[in-house]
């Protein structure tokens, strides 16, 4: 049999293939389509409010009766100090001027208008809404949340970008670890926002496999049978794909963003903190080049909240220079088939 069965049995799915939780790209329709293909769909809840999380969970359950993972950010929320307030004002002024110079009309929010939601609200929602799988990134859950979730029979999937992070997750009793290589698209799942591990995926996977006794999912660069086989040989028992689905019918990317993806070159794929305040891998553009090495980057989630309106305005203008188009290092042809078809094709290719 081609597929390892540890993850299948733990998660109650047919194939140990996981649709990556890509906030802003994956949709409830994508989650349901992944489930229909016999894979695990992942509902990206990021750092949404409890009410927003409930709405998306219920929408997903209307589309599928199969299990899916809810995915949340478990980041540290920086204290609002006088220094942060001053930097926020300067950054807001700089970004508004940058937008104006590039014919983007937008009013960015003040600090008082920004809502920050601790992940504990989402933990309560996930229990109340009877979700059975929770995946998380940007750190580790606190002990009390882990206990509550386990008491309610919820399987926990943590994200690591280093061996040390994997060991911390294992020590906390996390059921499954998702190993994210630095080549992966989107946000780095690192516990630290600043000094992120730089280790490549294959090196990291083999080392984590040697150090922990927890089933491993691998994320970063899987786009076909050869890449999946490579990480399977190194110990992965589950396989998370994101890039593969970026241009799918269920993707939230707009046509101009999908077209930009098709033309992307290797040297244009970069790590940046400019949009959100945390490192993420995506397509280099004017915004990144202007902001990345400036003093106008706030800590996450404040930078993310501040730039949100600018990104939305740029998207409405179909301006790829001021939106975050997240993509990993593995450049390939981006299929515009449905998520279900793309995943079934991957499964068929692997089983040949």
Regions found by a protein language model. Give the residues of each.
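Active-site entrance/lid segments in N-terminal catalytic domains of soluble metabolic enzymes
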Residues: 1-194, 198-211
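Conserved active-site-proximal phosphate/metal-binding subdomains
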Residues: 187-217, 222-352
């Amino acid at each position: 049999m081609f597929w390892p069965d540890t993850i299948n049995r733990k998660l109650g799915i047919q194939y140990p293939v996981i649709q990556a939780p890509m906030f802003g790209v994956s949709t409830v329709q994508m989650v349901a389509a992944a489930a229909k293909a016999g894979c695990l769909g992942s509902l990206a809840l990021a750092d949404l409010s409890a009410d927003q999380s409930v709405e998306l969970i219920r929408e997903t359950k209307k589309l599928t009766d199969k299990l899916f993972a809810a995915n949340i950010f478990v980041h540290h929320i920086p204290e609002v100090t006088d220094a942060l307030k001053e930097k926020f004002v300067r950054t807001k002024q700089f970004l508004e001027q940058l937008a104006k110079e590039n014919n983007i009309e937008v009013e960015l929010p003040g600090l008082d208008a920004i809502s920050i939601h601790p992940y504990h609200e989402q933990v309560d929602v996930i229990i109340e809404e009877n979700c059975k799988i929770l995946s998380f990134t940007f750190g580790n859950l606190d002990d009390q949340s882990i206990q509550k979730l386990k008491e309610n029979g919820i399987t926990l999937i943590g994200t690591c970008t280093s061996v040390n992070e994997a060991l911390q997750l294992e020590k906390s009793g996390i059921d499954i670890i998702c190993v994210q290589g630095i080549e992966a698209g989107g946000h780095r799942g690192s516990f630290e926002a600043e000094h992120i591990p730089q280790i490549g995926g294959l090196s990291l996977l083999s080392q984590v496999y040697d150090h922990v006794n927890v089933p491993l999912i691998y994320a970063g660069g899987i786009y076909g049978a050869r890449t999946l086989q490579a990480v399977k040989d190194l110990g992965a028992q589950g396989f998370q794909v994101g890039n593969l689905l970026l241009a799918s019918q269920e993707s939230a990317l707009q046509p101009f963003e999908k077209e930009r993806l098709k033309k992307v070159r290797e040297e244009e794929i970069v790590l940046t903190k400019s949009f959100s305040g945390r490192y993420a891998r995506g397509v280099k553009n004017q915004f990144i080049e202007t902001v990345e090495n400036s003093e106008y980057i706030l800590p996450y989630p404040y930078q993310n909240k501040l730039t949100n309106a600018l990104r939305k305005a740029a998207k409405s203008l179909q301006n790829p220079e001021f939106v975050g188009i997240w993509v990993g290092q593995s450049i390939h042809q981006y299929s515009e088939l449905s998520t279900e078809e793309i995943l079934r094709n991957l499964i068929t290719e692997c089983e040949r």
